[in-house]
């Protein structure tokens, strides 16, 4: 599968590296294809780098891994993505009164906002619930950690669930894209524990089921 990863910073490079290892063709979509660290990333993973609209055009799946502050302009500049599967890994974070908070909350979500920017695409919210370090660390756990996903198109969710599983996670369907309203605040639990409560970044969420 050709996967276009829009953004090649921590999240984008982690996801692209993981799926390259799983055998997918990775195309990083960036503003500057000549950056030294990007060239090193492509050499390490076998990926290629193109201007973001060109990468998105070529991808069977398009992954959005951008800072929320620049997301709207960058996504709208991608061009016609009609029918494409879009993975939204972004959390709508912003600084408010000196603290990191969600810009959107329980009455709307970043996932729904992305879907409104791309009304003819099939948007699936996932990979927003842990830090970049854990996104390709699923196979390091004795029991696969959980990664929820939300979207309105069941066929798209099936494809995305397979991609989630390939990175070592137990993919669980949270429902329609409206459920991004709970997945994005859920991500704040990881951020709070990892960055402010001393747990560190080397952990993920799991689902425990009773024996028998």
Language-model features: where?
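NAD(P)+-binding Rossmann beta1-loop-alpha1 motif at the extreme N-terminus of oxidoreductases
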Residues: 1-45
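Rossmann-fold NAD(P)-dependent oxidoreductase module
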Residues: 14, 18, 117, 163
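General beta-strand structural signal in soluble alpha/beta enzymes
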Residues: 49, 122-128, 172-174
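Rossmann-fold NAD(P)-binding glycine/threonine-rich loop
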Residues: 90-133, 137-139
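Active-site-lining helix/loop region of Rossmann-like oxidoreductase modules
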Residues: 145-212
């Amino acid at each position: 599968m050709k996967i276009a990863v829009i953004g090649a910073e921590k999240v984008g490079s982690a996801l692209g590296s993981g799926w390259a290892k799983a055998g997918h063709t990775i195309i990083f979509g960036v503003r500057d294809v000549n950056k030294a660290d990007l060239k090193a990333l492509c050499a390490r993973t076998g990926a290629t780098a193109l201007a973001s609209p060109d990468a998105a055009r070529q991808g069977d799946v398009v992954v959005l891994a951008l800072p929320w502050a620049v997301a709207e302009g960058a996504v709208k500049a991608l061009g016609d993505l009609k029918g494409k599967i879009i993975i939204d890994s972004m959390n709508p974070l912003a600084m408010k009164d000196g603290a990191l908070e969600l810009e959107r909350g329980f009455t709307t979500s970043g996932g729904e906002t992305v879907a409104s920017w791309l009304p003819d695409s099939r948007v699936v919210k996932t990979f927003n619930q842990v830090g970049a370090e854990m996104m390709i660390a699923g196979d390091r756990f004795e029991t696969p950690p959980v990664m929820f996903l939300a979207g309105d198109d069941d066929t798209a969710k099936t494809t995305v669930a397979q991609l989630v599983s390939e990175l070592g996670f137990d993919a669980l369907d949270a429902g329609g894209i409206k459920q991004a309203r709970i997945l994005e605040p859920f991500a704040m639990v990881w951020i709070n524990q990892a960055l402010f409560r001393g747990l560190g970044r080397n952990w993920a969420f799991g689902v425990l089921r009773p024996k028998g």
